[in-house]
């Protein structure tokens, strides 16, 4: 999820190119693109859903809130050199309000992983030599990236926040860290999905479903480890 031109599609391409052996876009509605991935012969349906960009349309915002609250993990993409965060803040408030409703207080919210994308475009533009140690930045670029991360952390209060560059034109930054964060969040995502099914009265045997989901997690983890 994210504003128009935040780089969501580029992020999806980077992730599915690294973590999946086969990828195909499934038919979908409301401008969302659903990606079906296969890892080690196991079909992972709806592993990634690329939502329409935030553009101030309240109807779009409502649909995105519905998708977020029915997701296991949310990747929220921000354009690093764009300081306007009104649309993102409004969406975050709408998501929080959903879980504050009495009818939804037993629901487990998915973890939100905010990605400050396109950090290579932050000043100074003539410097780009990743990786950058943001805990103790030694260059002006590193300091600006650290400031951008802190600014967006205060705006959106995510569970996890990472600076990122997935461009094909310059050296990438933090893609491996993002993959590790997704793998680490998998168990929480499984619990979020099982909670959602339980609250909604899903008749599926949740014990068996939990076993299936954890097995898929093992497959993803092995696929990730192969890249190290």
Model-derived features with residue positions:
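A conditional alpha-helix N-cap/helix-loop micro-motif detector
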Residues: 28, 54-60, 142-145
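Conserved ASCE/P-loop NTPase catalytic core
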Residues: 47, 51, 59, 131-133
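C-terminal end of P-loop GTPase domains and the immediately downstream helical coupling element
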Residues: 107, 113, 119-228
